[in-house]
Amino acid sequence: MKNLNLVALPHFVSVENLKNDEVKALIKRAEYFKKSGAVARLTSPVYVTNMFFEDSSRTHTSFEMAERKLGLTVIPFDPAHSSVNKGETLYDTSLVMNALGIDLEVIRHSQNEYYEDLINLKQHQKLNIGVINAGDGSGQHPSQCMLDMMTIHEHFGHFKGLKVAIVGDITNSRVAKSDMELLTRLGAEVYFSGPEYWYSKDFDQYGKYEELDKLIPEMDVMMLLRVQHERHSGDPNEKKFDAHRYHEKYGINHKRYEAMKKDTIIMHPGPINHDVELSGDLVESDKCMFVRQMENGVFMRMAMLEAVLRGRKLGGLE
């Protein structure tokens, strides 16, 4: 691809340290992969393993598809049958993978910022492996964030001045935290809605909380979030949760769908709870980008993986 500044990174664990021009370059690279069908040409083998300590369908399969399209050799890893169950630390597991010849790890883990121990090494530590964060607890989800940015850019062609509403279980959503960070930096106006008990004043620096029906007619993007029941341990509001009531107050139904602007898009990181965040028969509607997001995820993850290959000079890429 001509006239493109290709990104090179030693790891890809968060969007916080990405420069705006790197974000835009990754979007362009992913769009190039999608339109051209081209892939990076590796001149030497690269070995990757996907270490998912939390359940995943989309992200796990999407990363593996991206890896295979790039020509990487994927080495299976099953946490349920690993030595982690014998008490082995994530660092030691990574050290084992590294010693066996693994070049890259794609990791999803319930611990926030689990990657700090793997990338900020002490003087005596010898771990030398690229880490791609596929989601850390309620912290960050950089690949979902980047595919969201790609999907928005693909539809609108820009970010500046777009009005984006992030709706739902915001406090427990790693997607929301990554997306609000990048959207505001790229010039979008961010708004929040959903149950106030799942909203934190910490988010006020990124946008404004409003009632959903006030936002509906004004927004360009409606970004819906799954209710994260698995992260509500000890939360008294979980016991009071009622799916029908949530859908009535915070979900996108036909009435709200019809009240949106003509060009408004609906996004959701998945999995969608039908008739909770979104009416089930709207999942494949014209405005809903759910399927498009999944399609774009493969190409964006190719761009992210390629950036780490370049950063680590793997596969003959520099």
Curated annotation (Swiss-Prot):
EC id: 2.1.3.2
Positions contributing to carbamoyl phosphate binding: R58, T59, R108, H141, Q144, G270, P271
InterPro entries found in the cross-reference section: Asp/Orn_carbamoyltranf_P-bd, Asp/Orn_carbamoylTrfase, Asp/Orn_carbamoylTrfase_sf, Asp_carbamoyltransf, Asp_carbamoyltransf_Asp/Orn-bd
Pathway: Pyrimidine metabolism; UMP biosynthesis via de novo pathway; (S)-dihydroorotate from bicarbonate: step 2/3
Free-text function comment from the UniProt entry: Catalyzes the condensation of carbamoyl phosphate and aspartate to form carbamoyl aspartate and inorganic phosphate, the committed step in the de novo pyrimidine nucleotide biosynthesis pathway.
Subunit structure: Heterododecamer (2C3:3R2) of six catalytic PyrB chains organized as two trimers (C3), and six regulatory PyrI chains organized as three dimers (R2).
HAMAP family hit by this protein: Asp_carb_tr
Protein family membership: Belongs to the aspartate/ornithine carbamoyltransferase superfamily. ATCase family.
Name this polypeptide is given: Aspartate carbamoyltransferase catalytic subunit
Source organism of this protein record: Lactobacillus helveticus (strain DPC 4571)
Taxonomic lineage of the native organism: Bacteria, Bacillati, Bacillota, Bacilli, Lactobacillales
Gene: pyrB
